[in-house]
Curated annotation (Swiss-Prot):
This is UPF0200 protein MmarC7_0527. Transmembrane segments: none annotated. InterPro entries: NTP_hydrolase-rel, P-loop_NTPase. GO terms for molecular function: ATP binding. Pfam families: AAA_17. Keywords: ATP-binding, Nucleotide-binding. Coiled coil: none annotated. ATP binds at G8, M9, P10, G11, S12, G13, K14, S15. Belongs to the UPF0200 family.
Length: 183
């Protein structure tokens, strides 16, 4: 199994990989979907506080790689060992280490400034996003407490998403092509 991990702070542009993945016929598994599913399963409203608290509780109960385990189990059940699979939303170095024990893994970090990310999240209208700056900052702090900063700093590739969307997609696609070609 060849995994491509996508990391970045909320609103950085991680989900853009989904459109490229379709083009290259690569499956995307979202770690955030695992957390949102668990939040809903508990009967909680999908909002930044509940989703964030669920992520924290899952890691407290099942270890710091708690979100990576069901993602990898799903991938192993559904896909051929020769397939590329993208794991979107890696947040901790523990998740990276867990995935690397079980598969070849390259990490792409997507970076955007806090202001750019806040503007995007404010307009995205997803249940677990907020248009309140203080809630945004709290979410960033929670993400940083998961050690996402370490994952970003130690990533294999970095794509900056500050300007034109088409330029970002072009850079992201070139990075994806380089990973596929290197294999």
């Amino acid at each position: 199994m060849k995994l491509i991990g996508i990391t970045g702070m909320p609103g950085s542009g991680k989900s853009a990989i989904t459109k490229l993945a379709e083009k290259y016929k690569i499956t995307v598994v979202s770690m955030g979907d695992v957390v949102r599913h668990e939040t809903s399963k508990q009967g909680l409203i999908l909002n930044p506080e509940n989703v964030g608290n669920t992520a924290v509780k899952l890691r407290e109960l099942h270890g710091k790689e708690a979100i990576a385990i069901p993602c990898l189990n799903y991938v192993n059940e559904k896909y051929n060992c020769e397939d590329f699979v993208i794991i979107e939303g890696i947040r901790s170095i523990y998740e990276v280490n867990y995935l690397k024990k079980h598969a070849k893994l390259d990490i792409i970090a997507i970076h955007s400034s806090p202001k750019t990310r806040f503007d995007r999240l404010s307009g995205r209208n997803r249940e677990d996003d907020s248009n309140d700056w203080n809630t945004f900052v709290e979410r960033d702090e929670r993400e940083l407490n998961f050690s996402i900063g370490n994952v970003i700093a130690l990533s294999d590739y970095m794509v900056v998403n500050e300007g034109n969307y088409n330029d970002f997609i072009h850079d992201l696609e070139n990075t994806l092509k380089n990973i596929i070609k290197a294999d």
